[in-house]
Amino acid sequence: MAMTKRNGKNDTIILNTIEELVPQDHDVRMLDNCIDWSFIYPLVENLYSDVGRPSIDPVVLFKMIFINIIFGIGSMRKTCREIQVNLAYRWFLGISMDERVPNYSTWSQNYIRRYGDSEVFEEIFDQILKQAISYGFVDMETVYGDSTHQKANANKNKYTDEEVEIMKKIYENDLLDEINRDREEHGKKPIKKNEKEELNFDEETGKLKRDIQTKHIKISKTDSESGCFHKGEKEKCFAYSHQIFCDRNGFVLASVCVAGNVHDSVSFFSAYKVLNDKYMDQIKNVCLDAGYITPAICKTILENGQKMYAPYKRPMTKKGYYKKYEYVYDEGYDCYLCPNNKVLSYSTTNKLGYKEYKSNPKDCENCPLRGRCTSSKNFQKVVTRHVWEEYREEVMDEIRHTPEWKEIYPRRKESIERVFADCKEHHTLRYTRLRGLQKNQHQSLMIFACYNLKRMSRWRWKSISKTAQNLIKSTILNYFKKKEKRYLFISTTLSTI
């Protein structure tokens, strides 16, 4: 076969509409078909003035963000350039060929002047999720929770080391009440609440001393609201952490953004509150990983009438020493028995919520198992037990061994882990170009809203296509059934000849 060389010409005149040129199975048609985009107008109506020159349609602005995230473009400047030459994007936005595409800075100025201090992003996220629920795509009987980090727009080598106050945990007051109740039962004095800060002055320098717990953290010079993230073998960097919950079908139900140095077990409570405020009555099971197995989290979930499903957590003890589960707790006598059958009696309940059980030094001094039990110089073994330990034991020793656990927990890898993988790979969750916690919270809501919308649109499109195919099949079958009946009628009729 001879080689052919074509001299391309770009002066062809095409007499077609944009509607005809956009393929029927293109993603933008799925997105446009699954939801009525006019729902945005009531959400932003109070952010616009009743007088003045006409603005750019807010639906067009938000659709540009959806194009930016769903198709993984990332940059708004690049998104505007893509819209100029992409007929499918123009069709989705409702912009004709001779109409000018909005400038990339238009969205930035609208965010600064209108949308930044509003709740429109959360409302859009909720509206898309409600639409998915109305289609029957969301199953909230079991929810899956986890967090992932997103690298911040900050140099990891430019930071200052600062001393900051340790923030009070959300359950600290309830924990203190439980500690004092336990101490009073054992004849101990209750721990006082630090409701008012006492002013103490140093006798030598005369400076004010504050009775506040502090810690040293690294604060970025570029983005001070991000946090230094360092976990296992992952690269040490400044990042933001996204705590989310999704259903078994992968639809994101709630999302909260925090600094990257906040532990998952701390950010859990804010995201769990957002989830429960909306869907508490529908949730029966909460599935989490090993990082969330704390007495406070177990207590919170179980007291809400929900079951917590979590994996086995390896004991964090020194190599060569007895594990904590090898010390048997006697609930009746409120004591522990060591592997040598010696009693560890209750001593006190500390301010962290742990009851301390101590052995008799005389029993430990000549014990043949002391080398595997304790290395203390005073020959005394101390075992601690949290005041809410029974909730953790219910999760780890009872629920974890049920048949439901074997069905629910393995689905984590195909639900919430899939959400993180898709959003990082296709929807700009791996890095952020924005600086500041509020901006990244808004961005994360839009990313997960786009993820829900894309998932809903494809499921909706498949269901419509399947319905159409079934209708065609039933029509064809009915046609042949009628033909068959007619043939049978003719063949069974007696001849008059």
Task: Please describe what each predicted stretch is.
Residues 17, 43, 60-66, 106, ...:
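A general alpha-helix detector
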Residues 19, 23, 32, 36, ...:
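Amphipathic alpha-helical interaction elements
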Residues 72-85, 95-497:
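Anion-binding and metal-coordination hotspots
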